[in-house]
Amino acid sequence: GAERYYSEEVIRLPDGWISYAPPSYAPDVGFLPFHRNGFINFGSFNNPKKINESVLDVWANILMSVPNSRLILKYQNMDVEINKNRMIDIMSAHGVEISRLTFEGRSSHVDLLARYNDIDIALDPFPYSGGLTTCEALWMGVPVITVPGETFASRHSLSHLSNVGIPELVAEGPEDYICKVVELANDIARLTDLRSSLRDQMDKSALCDGEKFASVFTTVVRQIWNSWCLGERVK
């Protein structure tokens, strides 16, 4: 519905706009951490620039709705004081104790991926959703809850979740986002099932089918070229 904002013709691919190829060194998916912790660990490994006040308000609401839950925030500069203090101030205003928040900075990529074995549910920021971050969480067996908007940047996770076959994790708005997260946090059987099945499901999905993506993309590019050569409008 955003075609009117583009000066060029928008061409939509049938599945997604990227193909994800997981790194060979990605750790094995671990058991659901809830079973060893006895509480839910939420996580977001997104750029702190994406985590605005509205996002923090919603996440604070979630933490207050899921007793004893924690939130692990990780990014290369997430442990910088200016980022930590901004988030702590907002979350504290909602009654979230600082002890429930963990801020982690830069690490090797393999260690970042391994950290997902301590996360039960990943929280997607909005209106700028995760892209590669969402793919990595899913590959590590961690479900991601997202709320898409109208812009391309706000619909990355929507695309990935749809292509993997779990559109039920896509919320219709902030309130529905909270409801979906809280509901999933209280459904340990569902979380356990996702943990054990998500990587295989993703591996077999359109999101990880590089050959199909390459075939579709090159076909579209050839069609664009042929249309240009014939002086036709690209469709």
Annotate each language-model stretch with its function:
Residues 117, 125-210:
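Catalytic binding pocket for nucleotide-activated donors in carbohydrate/polymer assembly enzymes
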Residues 34-57, 76-135:
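Donor nucleotide-activated moiety binding/catalytic core segment of transferases
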Residues 10, 100-101, 167-168:
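Short, conserved active-site loop motifs that form the nucleotide-linked donor/cofactor pocket
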Residues 39-41, 70, 143:
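Residues that mark the start of a beta-strand
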